[in-house]
């Protein structure tokens, strides 16, 4: 028979390798709901509460905690236990005065890092389009779209945002309050490949017509390495613009 509708189940053995959960304890785990992040770059809230933060011993307890609305993602209450918490999301628990940033560790696993800055988050521009009225729509890595109103999209002084740049988005207002351009000399966070989870400075960018651009980076130890542009997330000039 044909598969009708979206899949609702996920076996643990088929879950993304960067999820921090035991594989052979049980057969199934939670499949994240479709939304702002892809499955391999996010964790459903239930796994965050139970397996990462260890606030619950089982799924039933974790669901009760989530359904109280005491857990916020990017300043908004999330009561759906399947909701994905993904890269650069700010997860807050106001009652416990705890705030976390979703990142990758050096093994590529999705992890949480404590942070003290909860009023803004970094988003990467993955695409941009001109919409009705000549205004510019920025498509960000976390699924959101931001409209930048301009009088003429062909003027470089108005169209300052480029694909690959990062923008600072206020929480929970969701408006752009800062901009970090992609380019040589900028500090980047590597989101894939052998050097995932590392911070490094961009040394050189090799533009290619048919394939992803190659970016040469240098980490704090002076080691140079290359990766593709989609794995490069700009976070600042000399230091990250947010606490990471």
Swiss-Prot record:
The keyword Plastid does not apply. One of its GO terms (cellular component) is cytosolic small ribosomal subunit. The gene is rps4e. Keywords: Ribonucleoprotein, Ribosomal protein, RNA-binding, rRNA-binding. One of its GO terms (molecular function) is rRNA binding. Belongs to the eukaryotic ribosomal protein eS4 family. HAMAP family: Ribosomal_eS4 (MF_00485). Residues 43-106 form the S4 RNA-binding domain. It comes from the Archaea. InterPro entries: Rib_uL2_dom2, Ribosomal_eS4, Ribosomal_eS4_central_region, Ribosomal_eS4_central_sf, Ribosomal_eS4_KOW, Ribosomal_eS4_N, Ribosomal_eS4_N_CS, S4_RNA-bd_sf. Pfam families: Ribosomal_S4e, RS4NT. This is Small ribosomal subunit protein eS4. GO terms for biological process: translation. The keyword Membrane does not apply.
């Amino acid at each position: 028979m044909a598969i009708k509708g979206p899949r609702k189940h996920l076996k643990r053995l088929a879950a993304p390798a960067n999820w921090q959960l035991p594989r052979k304890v049980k057969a199934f785990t939670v499949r994240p709901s479709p939304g702002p992040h892809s499955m391999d770059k996010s964790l459903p809230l239930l796994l965050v509460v139970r397996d990462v933060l260890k606030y619950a011993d089982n799924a039933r307890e974790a669901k009760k905690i989530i359904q109280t609305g005491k857990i916020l993602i990017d300043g908004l209450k999330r009561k759906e236990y399947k909701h994905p918490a993904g890269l650069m999301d700010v997860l807050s628990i106001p009652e416990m005065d705890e705030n976390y940033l979703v990142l990758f560790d050096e093994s590529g696993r999705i992890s949480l890092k404590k942070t003290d800055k909860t009023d803004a988050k970094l988003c990467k521009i993955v695409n941009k389009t001109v919409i009705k009225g000549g205004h510019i729509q920025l498509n960000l890595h976390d699924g959101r779209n931001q409209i930048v109103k301009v009088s003429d999209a062909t003027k470089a002084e108005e169209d300052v945002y480029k694909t690959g740049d990062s923008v600072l988005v206020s929480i929970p207002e969701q408006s752009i309050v800062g901009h970090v351009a992609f380019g040589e000399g900028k500090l980047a966070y590597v989101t894939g490949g052998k050097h995932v989870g590392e911070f490094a400075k961009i040394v050189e960018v090799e533009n290619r017509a048919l394939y992803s651009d190659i970016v040469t980076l240098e980490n704090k130890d002076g080691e140079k390495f290359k990766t593709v542009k989609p794995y490069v997330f700009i976070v600042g000039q000399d230091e990250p613009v947010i606490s990471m």
